[in-house]
Regions:
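Residue-identity detector for glycine
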Residues: 2, 6-7, 12, 16
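Domain-level signature for proteins that mediate thiol-based redox and metal-cofactor handling
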Residues: 11, 17-215
Length: 215
C-alpha cells in the first residue's frame, strides 16, 4: 500500500495487510470485502469468548474502547472479534485520516491495559445467550444443534477472516436465520456470501436446511 505524507497507508490501493509499529506495539490492518470497513489486529486477544457488535454510540457506552472509536466521528459501527477489531466508517468518510485516528485510540487503550468493558456491562460482553434465540420447535432441537455446531466450526472462522461475525437467531420450517455483524453487516457482497456460501455449506451438512436468510 502507498503511504501519504503522514505515513498512513491509503486504503484500497493494493491488496494485503499493512503493518503499523507504534511505540513498540505492532498493529496490523487489513481491508475487508466491505469497502466501508477496516480490520485492525493488535497482536493480542481482544475477546476471550464470543464477539460483540456496536451499531451506535449508545451501544458503545458499554465499552471504553468502542466509545472512544465512535467519538472520532465518521464511525457507524465497531465489532470486537477474538483477535481483531473491525471499524465501519460512514458515507464519505476519509479512511486515509480516520485510520490513523483509530490506530492512536487502539494504542492508548492497549498501552494503558484498560478494560474492554465497563463493569456494569460485564454480563453483555459475549454473543447473546441461548435464550435470546427465536422460539423454535422442540422437535427441531437436534437440527438446531447441528446448525449451531457447523456455524461455529465452519462459518464463523471464515467470516472472521473478513472482519465480520454471525449470530444464529432461529430455525423455522427449513429456514435458518442468521444475523450478520461487523464487516459482513451492510457489505455489498453479504447477500452472495449468505446465499452461495453459508447456505450451500449448511444445506450440505444439514439436509433439513432449505434456505438461509438474514435476521
Amino acid at each position: 500500500m502507498r503511504s501519504d505524507a503522514g505515513g498512513i497507508d491509503k486504503i484500497g490501493l493494493a491488496p494485503g495487510p499493512a503493518l503499523h509499529q507504534i511505540a513498540c506495539m505492532l498493529i496490523e490492518t487489513e481491508t475487508t470485502p466491505n469497502p466501508a470497513t477496516l480490520k485492525f489486529l493488535p497482536g493480542r486477544t481482544v475477546m476471550e469468548m464470543g464477539t460483540r457488535d456496536f451499531a451506535s454510540p449508545e451501544e458503545a457506552e458499554a465499552s471504553p474502547l468502542a466509545e472512544a472509536i465512535f467519538s472520532l466521528g465518521d464511525v457507524t459501527g465497531v465489532f470486537f472479534g477474538h483477535n481483531f477489531i473491525s471499524v465501519t466508517s460512514g458515507p464519505g468518510a476519509d479512511w486515509s485520516s480516520l485510520k490513523g485516528d483509530v490506530l492512536s485510540v487502539l494504542l492508548d487503550h492497549f498501552s494503558a491495559d484498560m478494560p474492554l468493558f465497563r463493569a456494569a456491562s460485564a454480563a453483555g460482553i459475549s454473543v447473546p445467550p441461548e435464550d435470546s434465540d427465536w422460539p423454535s420447535n422442540p422437535e427441531d432441537a437436534d437440527i438446531v444443534a447441528q446448525i449451531k455446531e457447523r456455524s461455529e466450526t465452519r462459518v464463523r472462522p471464515a467470516v472472521a477472516n473478513d472482519g465480520g461475525g454471525i449470530v444464529y437467531r432461529g430455525f423455522d420450517k427449513g429456514v435458518v436465520y442468521l444475523q450478520m455483524q461487523g464487516a459482513c453487516s451492510g457489505c455489498p457482497s453479504s447477500s452472495a456470501t449468505l446465499k452461495h456460501g453459508i447456505e450451500s455449506l449448511l444445506k450440505h451438512y444439514v439436509p433439513e436446511v432449505t434456505e438461509v436468510r438474514a435476521a
